[in-house]
Amino acid sequence: MDKVNNNCCCGENAKPCCTDPNSGCCCVSETNNCCKSDKKECCTGTGEGCKCTGCKCCEPAKSGCCCGDKAKACCTDPNSGCCCSSKTNKCCDSTNKTECKTCECCK
């Protein structure tokens, strides 16, 4: 049985994307695992066997891209064009790692 990534936890330390209805992920209260929202049985059923496999939310965060506990989902989404600066915890442009001035995520 695959080990569930603890970063997918939907408890106190849940990633913002786990609770964002637009992210394609949701939380299973019974098991506190993040799962794809198209698997409704994961969200409303027993949660048994629910594993987070295709959900981007549950992939490990790239180092240097973390914006703290309350990071916006787009800051950790590799497809958003944004990333986070670990030094200042500000959202920044992923192409040049400078502080984000034009990224929609940071508005």
From Swiss-Prot:
Induction: By cadmium. GO terms for molecular function: cadmium ion binding. It comes from Tetrahymena pyriformis. Residues 1-2 form a propeptide. This is Metallothionein-1. Keywords: Cadmium, Metal-binding, Metal-thiolate cluster. The metallothioneins are involved in the cellular sequestration of toxic metal ions. Binds 12 cadmium ions per molecule. It holds the Pfam family Metallothio_Cad. Belongs to the metallothionein superfamily. Type 7 family. InterPro entries: Metalthion_7.
